[in-house]
Amino acid sequence: YADAVARATPAVVNVHTAKVITRRVHPLLNDPVFQQFFGDRFARSRKEIQTSLGSGVIISVQGYVLTNNHVIEGADEIQVLLNDGRSARASVVGTDADTDLAVLRIDLDKLPSIVFGNSDNLRVGDVTLAIGNPFGVGQTVTFGIISATGRDRLGITAYEEFIQTDAAINPGNSGGALINAHGELIGINSAIYSRSGGSQGIGLAIPISLAKGVMTQIIEQGHVVRGWLGIEAHDMTPELAESFDLSFAHGMLINGVMRGG
């Protein structure tokens, strides 16, 4: 699978973020008795730089980078490091918390870009390769298979149809590429099921079929628009049917209409 890896790795990047956080002091440090001896040097709030890392995928030569929303959420500065050693500051084009996706943009010449595969035709047992920056050690490739498709009801995001793989995915892999045996992008590595914090053989990736629709809307209009009914509804029960003098007990009761619905 070296050819597949060689085809995809130039387009997989490391994403480094930094944000300024304010550390609040312990209430005890504001105690007048404490300050009598030590003054207020310990009582002042402190600003610190918090850094984190993740991965991303260059999806076009125009410099668009697809990653996870949780990788860059709240960041004051985002730096993208390419496999060829170049780096650039990234701007946020848009994010979608409901799918945990984000699109960044970098301004560099002669950029590589990933080739999209088809995640709708995946079968359990197909070979997969995960590419990312686990624990910040540098670009790493792991091997596995498709363990399941369409994983949902996991409580991770609002819209879920995850690809499950046993290719090792660890902290730092988030936003990186899940590719097939041809080096084509089939998913964005997003989460793991683990009690230890490291890989235990259950990695989850957002299928590219879902990600493409989200990233297209973000690039074209800066955000994602979804249809909604705007109603409050309740399943019909035999008790409700009787109270409304209905001869059937199936369907849905509309309790109310939301503003704009």
Q: Where are the language model's segments positioned?
A:
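Serine-dependent protease modules
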Residues: 1-260
